[in-house]
Amino acid sequence: MTQLTKYLLFVFLCLSVIQLNAQQNDSITDTNLVTFKEVSYTLIGPVKKGMASFYSLKFEGRKTATGAIFSHAKYTAASNHFPLGIYVRVINPKNNKYVIVRINDRMGKSMSKKGRVVDLTRLAAKEIGIFKQGIGKVLVQKVEKQANK
């Protein structure tokens, strides 16, 4: 084999590896995107496993930790595991249904000790299928809204 043939073979192999790596990076990016209510979000960070419950009716109309007025008709949640103001995806692993909710409140300390990761609104709990039993196992992960294109 001549020097030129070896060199061309080396360049071809390098370009093949670069192309394969680019294809793998594209697929990773695609799997990190989720859509909820026609808005795209990027999944960020580790998944937190735990239990979810939903707020009692007595909290309707009260102020949350962020100062917002609580409503069971919104996609919000309380959590002691995530910062206030961020969005998270909450998945019910039994049926793979999920919601995106904004963390705008804190839970009572006793709820965290019981393994609760989030306390959802009734709307969110119904959407992922934990409303009837009142509590359910969930996977929770931080998300960020994608910029409008």
Question: Where do the model's predicted regions map?
Answer:
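Secreted/periplasmic proteins
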Residues: T2-Y7, N21-K149
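Bacterial N-terminal signal peptides
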Residues: L8-S16
